[in-house]
C-alpha cells in the first residue's frame, strides 16, 4: 500500500511534516550562506528583522502575502477537482486587465468602496475567461491542463505587453502602463491596523485587499467543504471513476472548477494594481502565480493553511530583500536560491518525510 494513501493524524500531516520540510530547507539555505562567507545566524536574524521587526516590514510582508493567498487559493480549488492549474500567473495578468478597466472607467465618478466590488468582479471574470479555454480543452478534448495553462501564461503575458504598449499607454509617454488611477480607483492602506499595535505602516503598500483575501478564503472553505459542488469537486479529485458512478458530470465539474480557479487568480490583481501602483504595468504579477503552487501545497490545499503559508512566503520575500541590502555578498540571485529551496521542499518534495512518518506512526500504534 502506498504511504501517500495511509491516513495520519492532522498534527503530523498538517504540522510536523511541513515543519520538517521547512527546517531542512533552511538548513540547506544556511549552508549556502556559510559557503559564500556569511553567518547563517546573522542572515536569519536579518530575515526576521526585515520582515517582522517594524510596522513597515510587517506591512510589506502582509502585502506580499495577500497576493500569495489569492494565487494559493486558485491552485487549491483546481487541485481539489484533480486539476493542476499552472496558469495562475497568466490568469492574474489578464485579471489585472479587468481590474484596471473598471478603475479607469469609474475612478472619476465614484469613491473607492463603489469601485472595489466592481473591480473584484471584473478581475474575477477576466481571470475566469482566461482559464475557460484550457478548461474546455481538458473537459471536451482531453488536452492536458498543465500543458495548456503553461502555454496560456505566455500568451497572457504577450497580450498584456501588446495592450500596454499599443492600446492603454498614456499618449506621449514611453512607459508601457496606464494612467495613474484617481482616488476613486485606489484601495486605501491599512495603516490603522499597525497603529493599534503602536507601529507605523510607512511606505508599505499594505491595503484593504488583504481583508478581501481573508473573506475570499472563508468563502472558498464554505464552497469546498460545505456545498454540493464542493463535494462533487473533491469526489472527482479523489476518484474520477467513483465520480462517474455517482453521476457527477465530468465536463461540467472540470470547467466550473477551472473557472473558479481562474477567477481567484484574477482577483490577485487588486493588490498590486489598485492597492500599490494605482495603475496597470507590465509584469505586475511578479511570479506570484507560481509561488501560489508552493503556498497551496505547503498549506495542504486548505484555506487556513494557505493563509499561514502565504505569510511565510511574505516573510521570505520581504526579509530576503532586507538581507540582500544589509549583506552585499548575498545577492538577489542568492535570495532567489533560498526561496527556491523552500519552494522545492514545501512543494515538490512535500512527501519526502511522509514514508518515515508513516512507519514511525504505525510502529507507535502497534507498540
Task: For each feature predicted by the language model, list its residue ranges.
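Single transmembrane alpha-helix segments in multi-pass membrane proteins
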Residues: 31-36, 46, 51-106, 120-143, ...
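Short, non-helical or kinked segments that cap or interrupt transmembrane helices
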Residues: 38-42, 79-98, 139-148, 232, ...
